[in-house]
């Protein structure tokens, strides 16, 4: 074989190994300095992944020693979600450059801060959402539902935590994990409110479902993508260990700027056997934002939910677009709050748990799989939403009560 042919084959082999990419978003807002999410290629074995993490840790420590730095940082979270593998942590740019050179790495993404998708809170006021989703026509305050009410389904509230001792949960709620830091409690109230809509005895839809608190956002309602992916990772592993895959739902009433890693992790969790309802997000009414520009609302296979008003219109704050699968009540929703209390909130945060709750109820009553739930809800949904937004469905959530 000629030297020219050998050289050609050599360089062809080199080019066949695609270099890892550092995803650098044009919008730099909410980026956490020196914090990264590293995602492996799909063909990397678990054993090779473990070896890679040991190598990356050694590189990190060597760079610190070379710089004479006393900083710690390094690897923080490890992700294994239905074959999707990655990790996150605080690393110097020199370490990230070495990681990008590794053939097992698919891409590296800067970590970002994340926020809730609720807007306003007003304590102790009446609600309307339950009556609306159980009747074809507006204006009925009675909630009509199948008595199985989510029995046998496990709900994962990926949020600010849940007041697991709230009387409306009747002992069905347990604490799961905390990736946000702080106390193992809901110091904000958002997570308890969304959980109450999903599975509260008085304020909820799937009144017999189990609840698991997955705290990924702080008392101030903020967090990081890396911690949210870890919450998803923990939930999948918990569901697998407790034989709940295929019989589980998750609500994600949170959002932030577009993230490839968050979208992939959320999609893998859905495909692993958890039905996931995601808030479409809220923006200033003058912005008119497309949910395709946010995560995890733009993730594949999940059920993205926009917010409707009491008059069956699109809420002025609600994101819209082709990613939206369905609308659900999202203004002035009363539900549980910490300390055995109740309160009123508005936002796509309040719409998504209606879908998670009906999803749990439909899974229990019809025996369908998580992958079938969203299409089923769209199938039975009501064509009621006025001004839904350009290229957006006009379907409103309905629990198929027959009323």
UniProtKB/Swiss-Prot annotation:
Limits of the Inhibitor I9 domain: 35-116
PANTHER family: CEREVISIN-RELATED (PTHR43806:SF11), PEPTIDASE S8 (PTHR43806)
InterPro entries in the cross-refs: PCSK9_ProteinaseK-like (IPR034193), Peptidase_S8/S53_dom (IPR000209), Peptidase_S8/S53_dom_sf (IPR036852), Peptidase_S8_Ser-AS (IPR023828), Peptidase_S8_subtilisin-like (IPR050131), Peptidase_S8_subtilisin-rel (IPR015500), S8pro/Inhibitor_I9 (IPR010259), S8pro/Inhibitor_I9_sf (IPR037045)
Task of the protein: Secreted subtilisin-like serine protease with keratinolytic activity that contributes to pathogenicity.
Propeptide residue range(s): 20-117
One Gene Ontology cellular component annotation held by this UniProt entry: extracellular region
Family affiliation: Belongs to the peptidase S8 family.
Subcellular location: Secreted
Protein name per UniProt: Subtilisin-like protease CPC735_035780
CDD domains, A to Z: Peptidases_S8_PCSK9_ProteinaseK_like
Enzyme Commission number: 3.4.21.-
Region forming the signal peptide: 1-19
Location, primary (coarse class): secreted
One Gene Ontology term of the molecular function aspect: serine-type endopeptidase activity
Carbohydrate attachment residues: 233, 251, 399
Organism: Coccidioides posadasii (strain C735) (Valley fever fungus)
Top-tier EC class: hydrolase
Domain of life of the native organism: Eukaryota
Residue ranges of every copy of the Peptidase S8 domain listed in the record: 127-403
Keywords in alphabetical order: Glycoprotein, Hydrolase, Protease, Secreted, Serine protease, Signal, Virulence, Zymogen
Disulfide bond residue pairs: none
A matching Pfam family: Inhibitor_I9
């Amino acid at each position: 074989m000629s030297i020219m042919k050998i050289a050609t084959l050599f360089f062809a082999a080199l080019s066949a190994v695609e270099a890892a990419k550092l995803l650098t978003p044009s919008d730099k807002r909410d980026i956490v300095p020196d914090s990264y999410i590293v995602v492996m290629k799909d063909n990397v074995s678990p054993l090779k992944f473990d070896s890679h993490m040991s190598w990356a840790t050694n590189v990190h420590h060597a760079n610190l020693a070379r710089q004479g730095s006393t900083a710690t940082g390094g690897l923080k979270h490890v992700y294994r979600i239905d074959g999707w593998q990655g990790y996150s942590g605080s690393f110097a740019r020199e370490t990230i450059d070495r990681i990008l050179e590794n053939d097992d790495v698919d891409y590296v993404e800067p970590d970002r801060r994340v926020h809730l998708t609720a807007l306003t809170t007003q304590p102790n006021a009446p609600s309307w959402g339950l009556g609306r989703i159980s009747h074809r026509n507006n204006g009925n305050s009675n909630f009509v539902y199948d008595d199985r009410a989510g029995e046998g389904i496990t709900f994962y509230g990926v949020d600010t935590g849940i007041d697991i001792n709230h009387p409306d949960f009747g002992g069905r709620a347990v604490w799961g994990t905390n990736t946000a830091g702080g106390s193992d409690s809901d110091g904000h109230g958002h997570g308890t409110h969304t959980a109450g809509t999903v599975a509260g005895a008085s304020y909820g839809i799937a009144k017999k479902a189990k609840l698991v608190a997955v705290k990924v956002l702080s008392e101030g309602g903020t967090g990081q993508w890396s911690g949210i992916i870890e919450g998803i990772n923990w939930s999948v592993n918990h569901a697998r260990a407790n034989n709940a895959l295929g019989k589980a739902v998750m609500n994600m009433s949170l959002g932030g700027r577009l993230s490839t890693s968050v979208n992939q992790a959320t999609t893998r969790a859905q495909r692993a056997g958890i039905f996931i309802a995601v808030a479409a997000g809220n923006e200033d009414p003058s912005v008119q934002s497309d949910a395709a520009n946010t995560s995890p609302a733009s993730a594949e296979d999940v059920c993205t939910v926009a917010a409707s008003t009491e008059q069956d219109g699109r809420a002025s704050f609600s994101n819209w677009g082709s990613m939206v699968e369905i609308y659900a009540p999202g203004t002035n929703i009363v539900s549980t709050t910490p300390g055995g209390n109740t309160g009123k909130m508005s936002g796509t945060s309040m719409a998504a748990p209606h879908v998670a709750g009906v999803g749990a109820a439909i899974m229990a009553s019809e025996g369908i799989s998580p992958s079938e739930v969203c299409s089923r809800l769209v199938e039975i949904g009501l064509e009621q939403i006025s001004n839904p937004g350009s290229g957006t469905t006009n379907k409103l959530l309905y629990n198929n009560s027959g009323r």
